[in-house]
Amino acid sequence: MGLGWFGISSVWLLPMVWRYVARVMAGERGLKGPGTVRIWLATLAVLCASASLEALTSGRDLHGKAGGAVGRGLASLFGHMLGWTGAFLLMLGVLLWVAPMVFGHSWRQLLARLRQAGEAPPVQADARHDEADDGLKPTALGLGGAEQAMGSGHAGASRRHGIEAGSAWRQPAWQPPPRTRESPPQPGEIWPLLNAQGRPEMPLPVAAQPAPVPVPAPAATPKAATQAPSSRSALRATIVSSPFHRPQPSDGDQPPSSPEADDAPSAPVEDAAPAISPAAEPDAPASAPPEPAEPSPPTVDLEAVRQEAEALLAELRGLMTPLAAAPVASPEPEPEPEPEAETEVTPEAEAEPEAEPEAEAEPEAEAEAEAEAEAEPEAEAPAPESVAPALQEAEAATAAEAPLPAPEPAPAIEADDAAPPPPAVPAQKPRIVLPAVVGQVVSNAMPAPAPAAAPVAAAPPAPPRVVDYRLPNVALLTAASPDTVAVPAEHLEETSHLIAQRLAEFKVPVTVAGASAGPVITRFEVDPAIGVRGAQVVGLMKDLARALGVTSIRVVETIPGKTCMGLELPNARRAMIRLSEVVNAPDFQSHASHLVLAMGKDITGNPVVTDLARAPHLLVAGTTGSGKSVAVNAMILSMLYKATPEDVRLIMIDPKMLELSVYEGIPHLLAPVVTDMKQAAHALNWCVGEMEKRYRLMSALGVRNLAGYNQKIRAAQQAGHKVPNPFSLTPDAPEPLSTLPMIVVVIDELADLMMVAGKKIEELIARLAQKARAAGIHLILATQRPSVDVITGLIKANIPTRVAFQVSSKIDSRTILDQMGAETLLGQGDMLFLPPGTGYPQRVHGAFVADEEVHRVVEHWKQFGEPEYDEAILAGDPAEAAAGELFGEGGDAEADPLYDEAAAFVLNTRRASISAVQRQLRIGYNRAARLIEQMEAAGLVSPMGRNGSREVIAPGGGD
């Protein structure tokens, strides 16, 4: 990435060449004077730094052509010493540090300007400037030059075109250009004055001038009243056109000045206040004809003129005091109204001259002169073009009128220097009229100084960290115990003979065909004799269990693929099945689905896994202590071992606030673990909305499920295309679609959720169970009370995959599995698993996972960052929240003091009748109807049926 023109380029030499040409045109010594060496060194440093940057930014190819040999050499040198970044920052810092010096500025001057703009105390001048100001050189503009400046002819002045560059050692004498306006200026109009060097003068202090230092003069002449400021002074001044009388100009002109004239002594700066000429107007355009100067009487009282000018200047500076860069000790000026017309006044007066080195102050003076030229309302051309002829003419005129070279005493010494000035004579104050500019705003602030160069560019911000999710290692799980207890073959044979003998005693002849021992139970295959029905064997199971000395025997009437029955007897010693055994199994490792669940091991010891995406929902039920919560944890860990947050996101609802709260903070979560039932309803409602949104997207893309949708998005991304969102809020520029993760909703206790908001929750779960499979949203519902009021027919019909742990009755087993068998399970992880698509339950021993294992896996996932929660999941619908449809918080009926009594009556009597509540509570019909409707909104009673009756949904005290 070469910068082309940026390296060793003539662009950096233009300021120095321009300075040299301007000084030669002004008759100066072009390559000498203070500040020249600094400009030379700054130009050399800028060339080297820019060439090095050119070489460094050309793709780090230090052998290329970018930057030249010098740039490549410096880049190679500093690159080896500091590295590429260090060399780049070093060269950039050098470039920014010396760049202002190429143009004659310095960082100190720029910072001083910033402090002046902020009304900070002025920066004190260097001691060498103070010493230089104590012995100022004689002015280049003599008495004749001052008188000629007041004239209107300028006949002897030769015109030179082009803007003159000021000298850092000795400024050329300037003469103000002729008036070019068609009408004379109004009284009190402010014009900037250019000093003898060709630079605008600084405004003098606001305070009345102190007594001048007595300077012995061999010849005091009246011409001292119009003496120009010193050539070494870097101050600015303003000229006020006022109706007081001017001194009569002299007829004679002084001969041109020579270089030796700079060595003559000059008057102090304090005495230059009355030497202000009202005719110096360099900002006027040169297009209009000159205006004749105002005639002056032949004899003028110099002291009266001086005092009148001082009074007028003090009054004008009162207007400019708020604009000064720093406060100056002075008497309080008379308050004057703020001018409403725009006039750019840049007072920079100081009691002591605090000019920077003149090589640095020269560009500042030129910039301010340009700024004032732009502020002049009558200017019809850009500032440099309009000022250039006037500046050249003034220079030629004043150069011709400069005093003689110094072997002679300086004739321009003020007569007032010999004695203190008399008291000021009261005079009528002229009316100050400022030129108005239409369409511009009055600016009371100083012109903004040149902005400081930008600091060294900081290193570019690091790109966003791409999270490289790593699946947890199996070592985080506890390994299985190696000392497994195997059932000996002799024990199996002995038990087989004992089963046949006991059944023969009950006149049910059978033959034991075989036995297969597992980690928890042993299955004996029994072949009934001819004429023996299977029901006869099932009816003898309790007697057979008592005869064999076991807790329970489960009869499998039909074994798929075989003609025999199965008798499942528990082992004398149960083996613990660890989750690590199932996760390490090939069936789990080679499974392609991200939603594979490690269920456990079957009766023969083979690992059992299932795919939740094919289930597509799972219902888990079992009594307390049956291993239901451990199985849910094992299922969640199975998904955490197979899926990253980009593939699967989880929503966990834990009313007990114990089982699932340990997963708080893993990146898979879409929302914090929900423990409030109101937020649980909001989460399910959000899932329904997300399901509808995904269906619309899949329909627009022409795919049938979430896997097809993601495959189409990935194929487009690999081809370099973006699939636009067909439902974007900005159809003109739709955002591209991205892959969508699967969502698993885990509810640990459905019974509590149904009890609080049963009807609404049932509808939401039913909708998700019916349609959410293709949208990639799956449910895992767990409950410890598998009754019909919790697992309703609507939920059970849409969740074909079920897991039944030990239950207390055959009715609960039928509620879960639609068949018996769960009541005979052993507990502690012993389950009946009903796979999808089959009506045959499979006995599985669930994998055990300890709390320490869960914590280790959770900590592994937490190291990849915080989860990205969707706040809309738990926020809920504002309209629904306001109406209080779920919990009745927005209605007035629940606020009724009789609501609790009415609800208790309905739940106890199981009668949701308005008339019954009316009679029981002795209230009116309308009030009783509102109470019943509020119970319906809270999910206690069902909506009104066809015959007008309602059912009590929530369990009462009798259950």
UniProtKB/Swiss-Prot annotation:
What residues bind ATP, as annotated?
G625, S626, G627, K628, S629, V630
Pfam families noted in UniProt:
FtsK_4TM, FtsK_alpha, FtsK_gamma, FtsK_SpoIIIE
Start and end residues of each FtsK domain: 605-814
Record flagged with keyword Cell division? yes
UniProt-listed SUPFAM superfamilies = P-loop containing nucleoside triphosphate hydrolases (SSF52540), Winged helix' DNA-binding domain (SSF46785)
Q: Report the transmembrane regions from the record.
A: 1-21, 39-59, 83-103
What is one GO cellular-component annotation here? Answer: plasma membrane
Key words of the record? ATP-binding, Cell cycle, Cell division, Cell inner membrane, Cell membrane, Chromosome partition, DNA-binding, Membrane, Nucleotide-binding, Plasmid, Transmembrane, Transmembrane helix
Bias (Pro residues): 287-298
- Intervals, Cytoplasmic compartment: 104-959
Residue numbers spanned by region Disordered: 122-427
Family of this protein: Belongs to the FtsK/SpoIIIE/SftA family.
Quaternary structure, from the entry: Homohexamer. Forms a ring that surrounds DNA.
Protein's recorded name: DNA translocase FtsK 1
